[in-house]
Design a protein with these regions (language model features):
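Small/polar-residue-rich segments within soluble enzyme cores
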Residues: 1-64, 267
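Beta-lactam-recognizing serine transpeptidase/beta-lactamase-like catalytic domain environment
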Residues: 45-56, 71, 102-158, 162-279
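Conserved, well-ordered alpha-helix/loop/beta-strand core segments that scaffold catalytic motifs
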Residues: 54-95
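Generic short beta-strand
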Residues: 95-98, 108
Length: 283
């Protein structure tokens, strides 16, 4: 029995009828949690009746281990409420949130709203139950999916901090360097726009970061170059999984270095790569 029903369901996972872990922490730590069933071996006659005085061999049951996580019930509940509010306001199909200690990577909350009831993991609506078994399984897999680490997304402007890191660490830009944003940059035959129509005009790098200005980051990316960007990606672990103790973590998706030209470098500088919600937090 799971006392909190839906809370952190896509992190905890659940067990099957044989008490074997199926998803989440339950399957990842299954060999430590499941314990060992006890048994008694003895002699019986042809009718299966135990023979008096026969030798017995006993194997005592062994309890499974306890598992302590970094999840905080209060923070998890708070994050759930925040996700539900956003989901309702934005009419979103799902909302995810991670609360993490930036010093050591401990996860205090991981929410994938809507969650499911751990005590009824196979329940489906009447409409979905009417589908064939293959379709039902697809619904269940989607319902159980931990989108914080099983799915990748384009992070958008969140990625600009990585370009900024590359520029500053490799001394290709200083905070007071000046740039000009007319609202776009022409890269080869492509016109790549800023999010602000008409542009930000003259601005320092610091102001470009504050304004989340695409042309500024395209310029910084060009200064850093392909080698410098990929060096920074490697140092920040973008080519690797985080190694979280949960199953099914997806890998980052980005251009092969040999295929990155001027246009790809420009767009890469402000976001069009793909990685998990968790990878974004870890980085």
């Amino acid at each position: 029995v799971y006392p909190y029903d839906k809370l952190a369901s896509k992190v905890l996972g659940f067990t099957g009828g044989d008490n074997q872990g199926i998803l989440g922490l339950e399957v990842f730590y299954d060999k430590y949690l499941k314990g060992k069933t006890g048994r008694i071996r003895t002699l019986t006659d042809g009718k299966g009746v135990e023979i008096d005085g026969a030798y017995e061999e006993r194997e005592e049951p062994v309890s499974g281990n306890d598992l302590y996580t970094s999840l905080d019930v209060n923070l998890q509940n708070y994050a759930v409420q925040a996700c539900r509010k956003v989901k309702k306001e934005k009419k979103a199909k799902q909302v995810s949130m991670i609360l993490m200690n930036p010093q050591n990577g401990e996860i205090y909350a991981m929410v994938n709203e809507p969650e499911y009831n751990l005590n009824k993991p196979f329940s489906l609506s009447a409409q979905k139950r009417a589908k064939n078994s293959k379709k039902q399984q697809e619904y269940l897999n989607k319902k159980w999916r931990n989108s914080c680490l099983n799915d990748t997304y384009e992070p958008g402007s969140v990625f600009k901090i990585i370009t900024a890191t590359a520029g500053l660490e490799l001394s290709k830009v200083q905070v007071n360097d000046h740039f000009n944003c007319p609202g776009f940059r022409i890269v080869e035959d492509r016109k790549i726009r800023c999010h602000k129509v008409g542009g930000h005009g003259s601005e320092t790098f610091k102001e470009g970061v504050m304004n989340s200005c695409n042309p500024v980051f395209m310029d910084v990316g060009a200064r850093v170059g392909v080698d410098g960007m990929y060096q920074t990606f490697r140092q920040l672990g973008l080519f690797e999984k985080t190694g979280i103790d949960l199953p099914g973590e997806a890998s980052s998706i980005m251009h092969q270095k040999k295929n990155v030209g001027a246009v790809e470098l420009a767009t890469m500088s402000f976001g069009p790569v793909s990685y998990t919600h968790l990878r974004a937090h870890e980085t």
